[in-house]
Amino acid sequence: MSKKTPQAIRGTQDIFSADAEAFAFVVETFERVRKLYRFRRVEMPVFEKTEVFSRAIGETTDVVSKEMYSFEDRGGDSLTLRPEFTAGIARAFLTNGWQQHAPLKVATHGPLFRYERPQKGRYRQFHQIDAEIIGAAEPQADVELLAMADQTIRGLGIEGVTLHLNTLGDAESREAWRAALVEYFRAVASELSEDSQERLEKNPLRILDSKDRRDQQFLADAPRIDAFLSDTARAFFESVTTGLDAAGVKWQRAESLVRGLDYYRHTAFEFIPDEGSEAAGKLGSQSTILGGGRYDGLMESLGGAPTPAVGWAAGIERLAMLVGGAGFDPPIVVLAEHEHLFDTARLVVQALRLSEITAEAEFRYRRTNKAFDKFKKTGTDVFLVVDQVANLNGSHQIDIRLSGVLPDEEEELKLLAKRVELSLRLFFPDLIPKADPEKQAISWYLSRK
């Protein structure tokens, strides 16, 4: 047996410390907003029959043809690790009879798998938050879903991000637009990139999304969807934009924003950092942080009845890159000045935790100067030190001293001191605030014989 330690698989990651806290903060914020909007939580299998994805996503897409982790199980069935959530949720909707709950609002989060080149903020095992509304054909469903997405981003404290919005029209509009695009690009087919030449007959809308310079020179004059919108499709899009304005969600039109698969209808959208913003600087070329659209034709591809639906997904890793240390709540570290006070210090820690104050203590006694150094290296700047002082009458008192550095030190320490005092009184009802003329620290004492 080899003694060499196995390494992590390329494209995977071990998330730790501040990165893990930021990751958790994204999930916690999403869960909080999900509950505000009354989206039901669902948990989906990590793997499905391969046909769930090949039929839902499309055989010709890069995801299905190049990026899926598929394998044959012992029974001979072809299974695939999920590359996205929507197909599995659609399958569950059909096989579990969730039609009875329509319109159904569901949300989930978890790991997904795609075999692609790892890069900044993108991995082969990655994680997403996901929200879907199934069985609602009204444009107000799109507005609600987008308002939820906007509130999630704002709840994370991410600024400088704008909703980019387009319409793909209804089936009639889309087909007319598709035919016009094929005619337009056929005239310059020999000058297009190899990928776009391949897409010309199979998926011409994807050419509009090309970043290749050979294609981009022709995009400005390509036919636009607005010229082909039916009255119904135009009214739908106007209802969405009017609803967004009423909800206070800022948006801008993005006519080049498309979805290549035929089952997409009407609304397509992405939340993208503004040029020059802090978010754009952190993400680099991987600019989109949340995207989705209306997929009214998906259920039919899985053998179901026509069912309107709209959804979005966002990468947790990418969002975590933008929140920085927002998810990290620095603890109060409780230290004992002397070894015989160690148990008292542990009691102080428990009082803080029972009051929902993040607190930490050593597992064994350590001199306070060494403990200070250790915890400060981890970014901790707030301490409660338990000490003992002898009085002239032979009694002694236990001092509990709060000290630390906070962004707005004076005010924040005062507020924190009030919370700490209330929590300490759970176990120490005879706690007495101690006057400190020099204001070097906030402290309390307990009289003991």
Curated annotation (Swiss-Prot):
TM annotation in the entry: none
Pfam families: tRNA-synt_His
The protein's Enzyme Commission number: 6.1.1.21
Main location: cytoplasm
GO MF, one annotated term: histidine-tRNA ligase activity
Keywords assigned by UniProt, alphabetized: Aminoacyl-tRNA synthetase, ATP-binding, Cytoplasm, Ligase, Nucleotide-binding, Protein biosynthesis
Enzyme class label: ligase
Endoplasmic reticulum as UniProt keyword: no
Disulfide pattern: none
UniProt cross-references to InterPro entries, sorted A to Z: aa-tRNA-synth_II, aa-tRNA-synth_II/BPL/LPL, His-tRNA-ligase, HisRS-like_core, HisRS/HisZ
Subunit comment: Homodimer.
Protein's UniProt name: Histidine--tRNA ligase
Originating organism: Erythrobacter litoralis (strain HTCC2594)
Top-level taxonomy: Bacteria, Pseudomonadati, Pseudomonadota, Alphaproteobacteria, Sphingomonadales
